[in-house]
């Protein structure tokens, strides 16, 4: 069997290569690549990430979605209720919060367990062998982590004693410093023996809760044990000559892709203003807590009736396709001594918590812009997705718009992009001419504009990464 991979994580390709002699399928490659990314892509993701999965099952010829995004604890009864706010120059200016009290319940291991039980063909010990090895022997930083750590290493990852010790080699040399996560290696061995559910019910869960409690966090054992995925809250939209499958809520990411597509394909000179209005509509109307799923579904029906993240996509020749985007926020800086797992800071992402820090979100699914999708047309089936915070939707929509015109994924990914911010300011890559707009132009292939990855099966397997995010792709 042949398998293809496209990713924004440099080490994911090495993970795929590590099992290539075992005749892996698309699920096998996705599992080992995702775990490896959570080890190596420090700050970009972490071993306490959450994700959204969209996939196509080649046996049943059906598409599905799984929402395993962060959920707030049922109560905020931990000792630390202070907002430990920090400021970083990453992406211009970012305010976020650090500490164990920003930790939300992650769902990535529910996805990995589901994939392993239903689609994997290789024993779990083999799938986790490479991430166990690299976490124990050590690794140098990939470029996206270097770019992030230039801004975040001191304020976010050096305040915590254990984290500061583990990352000590990076203090003076981001390029050559080696990170070793021996405790995380032990935890991965535990996963290989007991399965991913140990994160929610077993010894790993107990170790996490001990650290959370000792450091003032709010997540409890009950919060871990009662975490549930949301299956098949999806839409299936015919748009021009494409069929697009994605999440219909409570995540708002796919809704925003469709709305960006709608504006980008209008024949108007007022496109920039319409994109500014769309950005503000998202902030003002879509980012709320409550029944977002029903709201998002209604918004998608209206479209149908009117004309810090990682992404990994995998496909195989048995027509299985997996599109996974996952995140840990900006990272909390907390490194759990017993498990070697860095904690997420999803309760502390200020821009995604409009109710305020530790506001009325108890037990709620948090807000996500992620949008892993499946696209089908007469020529084949494809996975698409991107990291990039609030640029995820605009990046994917521009690539889809390009593909509708040129039917070439490589050209569609490589064409210059632009993004309209909340205040109407436009940022664009060189080579793009925006008439009557004062835009700030960046260099070609700027990582600001996401990293759209595509895999698929036409006459043969296909994979293409994005030069904005390391251009990682692989076919065995």
Model-flagged regions — what are they?
Residues 230-231, 306-309, 368-370:
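Short, small/polar residue-rich loop motifs at catalytic or cofactor-binding pockets
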Residues 259-327, 338-339, 439:
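Internal maturation/activation junctions in enzymes
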Residues 39-65, 218, 320-382, 405, ...:
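Active-site rim segments in enzyme catalytic domains, especially the processed small/beta chain
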Residues 284-291, 364, 396, 403-446:
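Extended C-terminal subregions enriched in glycine
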Residues 187, 200-226, 284-300, 318, ...:
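Amphipathic alpha-helical
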Residues 246-249, 255, 375-392:
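Extended C-terminal regions of large enzymes
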Residues 1-194, 199-201, 206-240, 248, ...:
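Noncatalytic scaffold domains of N-terminal-nucleophile
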Residues 36-37, 45, 49-57, 310-315, ...:
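Short beta-strand scaffold segments in enzyme catalytic cores
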């Amino acid at each position: 069997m042949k398998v293809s991979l496209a990713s924004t994580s440099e080490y994911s390709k090495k993970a795929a290569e590590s099992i290539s002699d075992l005749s892996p399928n698309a699920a096998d490659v996705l599992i080992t690549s995702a775990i490896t990314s959570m080890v190596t892509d420090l700050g970009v993701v972490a071993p306490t990430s959450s994700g959204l999965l969209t996939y196509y099952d080649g046996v049943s010829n059906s598409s599905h979605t799984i929402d395993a995004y962060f959920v707030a604890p049922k109560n905020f009864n931990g000792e630390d209720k202070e907002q430990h706010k920090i400021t970083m120059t990453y992406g211009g200016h970012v305010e976020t919060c650090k500490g164990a009290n920003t930790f939300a319940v992650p769902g990535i291991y529910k996805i990995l367990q589901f994939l392993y039980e239903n689609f994997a063909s290789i024993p779990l010990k083999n799938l986790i062998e490479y991430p166990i090895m690299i976490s124990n022997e050590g690794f140098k930083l990939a470029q996206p982590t270097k770019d992030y750590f230039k801004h975040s290493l001191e304020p976010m990852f050096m305040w915590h004693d254990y984290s500061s010790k583990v990352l000590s080699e990076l203090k003076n040399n981001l390029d050559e410093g080696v990170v070793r996560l021996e405790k995380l290696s032990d935890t991965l061995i535990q996963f290989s023996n007991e399965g991913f559910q140990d994160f929610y019910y077993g010894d790993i869960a107990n170790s996490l809760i001990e650290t959370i409690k000792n450091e003032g966090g709010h997540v409890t054992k009950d919060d871990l044990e009662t975490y549930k995925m949301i299956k098949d809250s999806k839409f299936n939209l015919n748009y021009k000559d494409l069929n697009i499958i994605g999440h219909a809520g409570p995540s708002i990411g796919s809704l925003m892709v469709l709305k960006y597509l709608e504006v980008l394909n209008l024949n108007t000179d007022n496109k920039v203003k319409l994109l500014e209005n769309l950005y503000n509509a998202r902030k003002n109307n879509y980012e709320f807590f409550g029944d977002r799923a029903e709201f998002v579904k209604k918004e998608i029906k209206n479209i149908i009736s009117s004309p810090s993240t990682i992404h990994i996509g995998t496909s195989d020749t048995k027509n299985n396709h997996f599109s996974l985007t996952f995140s840990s926020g900006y990272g909390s800086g907390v490194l759990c001594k017993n498990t070697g797992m860095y904690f997420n800071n999803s309760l502390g992402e200020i821009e995604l918590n409009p109710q305020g820090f530790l506001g009325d979100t108890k037990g709620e699914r948090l807000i996500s812009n992620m949008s892993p999708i499946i696209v089908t047309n007469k020529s084949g089936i494809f996975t698409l997705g991107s990291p990039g915070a609030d640029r995820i939707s605009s990046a994917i929509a521009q690539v889809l718009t390009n593909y509708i015109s040129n039917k070439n994924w490589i050209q569609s990914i490589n064409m210059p992009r632009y993004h309209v911010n909340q205040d109407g300011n436009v940022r664009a890559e060189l080579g793009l001419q925006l008439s009557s707009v004062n835009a700030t132009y960046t260099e070609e292939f700027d990582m600001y504009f996401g990293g759209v990855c595509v895999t698929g099966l036409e006459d043969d397997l296909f994979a293409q990464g994005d030069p904005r995010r390391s251009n990682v792709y692989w076919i065995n």
